[in-house]
């Protein structure tokens, strides 16, 4: 018997909804490892929901799956955008839906994996992204301000103008902060108020991996050290030598920004490492505004449970039912 016996889209109204598994949680919590382990047992494909893993040539600090893992199991939306290529949330949403539907036609379970809350919400809640044309002059002024005074300055401005939007946007993602302020500037309304929701026709089961904060801090600190051992400095040098400027949105990611500063001579390597750890801790706290243990729509598991056979049975039970609420 196939794992997917239903249709999607307009024809789904009289049919069971096609399944979509979501694996979410903090950075460094083991989401990709769980997805890959599941896909080795259940016919599945993995779809990226991490805003940093979309870029090519940027592999180490983004902690992408390895090449061998991506060759063994179908992976979508990884390493397909050049570091200097603009890419919008609306484009991601469209491509994610295409990947989900493609996997359904292949009789594979789509597994959406990531920690970028905005990417996940755009797909799962069916956001209608505001059709506001870019204002290059306004954007340039904000980018210049962020470069001179720091990204925190314009993020604080967003917090004042639209507190709800500020809770949904990574403060380190300057491009998305600028976009939100741009929409507010051009429409006179709140960015958060313009996001109309139209959930897609999928039967969704969300699994979240929870690791106590202090334990997770220790894990990501060790991962920072490992990234340096894996050649992060050489990766950043290669990007800069190829002409990718440190001011690019893609280069604002944790690891790339700090190592670029070290290479430019503005900070020491020790300072770069400490900043990477500090920023990763801050990202974890930011992600916790998206992924709450009190969210009853998420089935929370421990790291140990994510490595057990029980999680495979849990997903099989989900596939065998027509109502995710029957899964406990």
From Swiss-Prot:
The protein's annotated catalytic reaction(s) are: adenosine(37) in tRNA + dimethylallyl diphosphate = N(6)-dimethylallyladenosine(37) in tRNA + diphosphate
Q: Which residues bind ATP?
A: 25-32
Q: Does the keyword ATP-binding apply?
A: yes
List the keywords (alphabetical): ATP-binding, Magnesium, Nucleotide-binding, Transferase, tRNA processing
Required cofactor names: Mg(2+)
Q: Where is this region: Interaction with substrate tRNA?
A: 50-53
* Physiological role: Catalyzes the transfer of a dimethylallyl group onto the adenine at position 37 in tRNAs that read codons beginning with uridine, leading to the formation of N6-(dimethylallyl)adenosine (i(6)A).
Name by which UniProt lists this protein: tRNA dimethylallyltransferase
The upper taxonomy is: Bacteria, Bacillati, Chloroflexota, Dehalococcoidia, Dehalococcoidales
């Amino acid at each position: 018997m196939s794992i997917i016996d239903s249709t999607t889209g307009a024809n789904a109204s009289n049919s069971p909804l096609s399944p979509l598994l979501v694996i979410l949680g903090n950075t460094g919590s083991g989401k990709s490892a769980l997805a890959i382990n599941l896909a080795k047992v259940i016919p599945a494909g993995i779809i990226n929901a991490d805003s940093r893993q979309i870029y090519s040539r940027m592999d180490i600090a983004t902690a992408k799956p390895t090449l061998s893992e991506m060759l063994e199991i179908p992976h979508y939306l990884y390493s397909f955008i050049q570091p200097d290529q603009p890419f919008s949330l609306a484009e991601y949403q469209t491509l994610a839906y295409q990947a989900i539907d493609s996997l359904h036609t292949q009789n594979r379970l789509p597994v959406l994996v990531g920690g970028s809350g905005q990417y996940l919400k755009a797909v799962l809640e069916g956001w209608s992204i505001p059709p506001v044309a870019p204002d290059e002059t306004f954007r340039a002024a904000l980018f210049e301000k962020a470069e001179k005074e720091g990204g925190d300055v314009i993020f604080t401005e967003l917090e004042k103008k639209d507190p709800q939007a500020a809770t949904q946007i990574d403060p380190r993602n300057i491009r998305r902060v600028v976009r939100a302020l741009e929409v507010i500037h051009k429409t006179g309304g709140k960015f958060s108020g313009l996001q109309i929701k139209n959930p897609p026709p999928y039967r969704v089961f969300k699994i979240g991996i929870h690791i106590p904060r202090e334990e997770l801090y220790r894990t990501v600190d060790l991962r920072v050290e490992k990234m340096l051992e894996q050649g992060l400095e050489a990766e950043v040098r290669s990007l800069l030598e190829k002409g990718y400027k440190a001011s690019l949105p893609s280069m604002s990611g944790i690891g790339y920004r700090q190592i670029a500063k070290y290479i430019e001579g503005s900070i020491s390597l020790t300072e770069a490492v400490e900043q990477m750890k500090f920023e990763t801790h801050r990202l974890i706290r930011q992600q916790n505004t998206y992924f709450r243990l009190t969210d009853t729509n998420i089935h929370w598991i421990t790291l140990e449970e994510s490595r057990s056979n029980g999680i495979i049975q849990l997903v099989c039970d989900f596939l065998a039912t027509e109502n995710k609420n029957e899964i406990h």
